[in-house]
Design a protein with these regions (language model features):
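Short strand-connecting beta-turns/loops that link adjacent beta-strands
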Residues: 46, 90-91
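Pocket-edge structural micro-motifs
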Residues: 43, 55, 87
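A short, N-terminal "cap"/entry segment at the start of jelly-roll beta-barrel domains
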Residues: 1-50
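Glycine- and acidic-residue-biased ligand/ion/polar-headgroup-sensing regions
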Residues: 71-90
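A broad, low-specificity signal marking well-ordered, structured residues that form hydrophobic/aromatic
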Residues: 39, 51-54, 76, 83
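Conserved short histidine dyad/triad with adjacent acidic residue
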Residues: 35, 53-72
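Generic marker of residues within folded, mature protein domains
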Residues: 43-46, 68, 75
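Short, intrinsically disordered, charge-balanced linker/junction segments flanking boundaries
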Residues: 94-97
Length: 97
């Protein structure tokens, strides 16, 4: 499986997240000004669920945000490395660090 074109939408029914894919997406993230890069697994932007592999390199920052659409959940799984996460309530008070 070639990981050379990471920005194209996946057409395979199964994509394995292996070391080669992690390394490739991380390499692109290191060369991006925001120090992060995602690889889409959903077939189109109109798909009801968006599945992404986000490579977030040291020094990157993701601003606090929320999804108002009740069908738009956000799940994070750390596959390697570590990250800091702050969870806020609807009024902006910190719930969890």
């Amino acid at each position: 499986m070639s990981h050379a074109t990471l920005n194209t939408l996946n057409t395979s029914p199964v994509t394995l997240i292996d070391r080669a894919l992690l390394d490739a997406v991380s390499a692109e993230a290191r060369n991006h000004p925001r120090l992060r890069k995602n690889r889409n697994f959903h077939r189109s932007d109109d798909a009801p669920g968006h599945r992404l592999l986000n490579a977030i390199e040291p020094g990157s920052y993701i601003a606090p945000h929320r999804h108002l659409d009740p069908h738009k959940d956000e799940t994070m799984l750390v596959l390697r490395g570590q990250l800091g996460l702050v969870v806020f309530d609807e009024n902006g008070a910190v719930l969890q660090v």
